[in-house]
Structures are given as C-alpha cells and as structure tokens.
C-alpha cells in the first residue's frame, strides 16, 4: 500500500478519532464523515483512499470503542503507523482489518505529506519522499491473514467456507 501521510502527535484518543456524539451508528461511511473531526475538522474531506496516518505514542487511547478504527477504515485509510498503540485499539484494528504498524523511528521521522509505501509481507516502510527505509516487527501469519481478509469476521467466514 502507498499513500500520503497525515501526521498526528502523542495520545490521540478514540475521542479524537471519532467523538462520542457520533456513536449512534457503526456504519463505516457515516463514521468516516466525522473521522478526526475534533483534531482536524476537514480531515475526512481531504484524506484520499490509501493515505496513511502517522502518530506518536499511545495512539487510540481512551475508550474501547471499535468505532474508532471503523471510522478510519471508512475513510479508506491504508494504514496507521505509530510509536505505540493503546492495546484495545491495536486489537480492534486487527479485528476490523485496519493495518497498524509500530515503528518508533518511522513515526518520529516521517513528515506530513510524505509519500510512503508499506510492504506488510516484507515488514518494510519506504519513504519515497526522503528515501529512507524502516523495518518493523512482522505480525504472525495468522494476524496478517486476518488483516488481509478485511477483519476477523471475514477471516472466520472464509475459513468456514461461507
């Protein structure tokens, strides 16, 4: 996957990603219309399919709402790169098939607007803007399969032949 980067700081909470006042639905398109609205009001209008969110420490902290990664996926975010993730956001992202990558160095050095490509199979991030390459700890194959399937439910249905 390849996209333009959107840079955020530390401690971006699930409330920053999708505010509680929009939780009356779990429909990805409806949530996408308000994704990151409190942090960047025009984000959902400016983001393009495949773009990548880059953030600092503790991305997705706060409440355990699954709506946050659903909103990001609804915006067609290609992946999130962060120094670290709140564990519940990390798990929810895998469950809905949103690729997430922990890389302190990449999160620190990638700039807003950089053109970045991620190869999940090779555990590599290539910043086409700076020419730098970063590696990250690969997921176990089953987790990669869940993400590739589009989330846990789709993965299970596929495994069951449904």
Language model features with spans:
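N-terminal, positively charged, Ser/Thr/Ala/Gly-biased leader segments
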Residues: 1-19, 154-162
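Conserved phosphate/anionic-ligand binding catalytic regions in large, soluble enzymes, centered on
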Residues: 12, 60-66, 147-157
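Pocket-edge structural micro-motifs
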Residues: 9, 56, 129
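Feature captures the catalytic cores and cofactor-binding loops of soluble hydro-lyases/lyases
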Residues: 16-122
């Amino acid at each position: 996957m390849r996209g333009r980067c959107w840079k955020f700081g530390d401690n971006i909470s699930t409330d920053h990603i999708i505010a509680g006042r929009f939780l009356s639905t779990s429909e990805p398109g409806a949530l996408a219309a308000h994704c990151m609205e409190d942090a960047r009001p025009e984000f959902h209008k400016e983001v393009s399919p495949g773009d990548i969110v880059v953030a600092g420490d503790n991305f997705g902290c706060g409440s355990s709402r699954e709506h946050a990664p659903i909103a990001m996926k609804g915006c067609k975010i290609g992946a999130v790169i962060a120094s670290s993730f709140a564990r519940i956001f990390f798990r929810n992202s895998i469950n809905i098939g949103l690729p997430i990558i922990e890389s302190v160095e990449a999160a620190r050095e990638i700039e807003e607007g950089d053109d970045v490509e991620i190869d999940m199979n090779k555990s590599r991030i290539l910043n086409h803007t700076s020419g730098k390459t970063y590696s990250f700890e690969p997921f176990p194959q089953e987790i990669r399969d869940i993400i590739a399937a589009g989330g846990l439910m789709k993965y299970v249905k596929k495994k069951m032949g449904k």
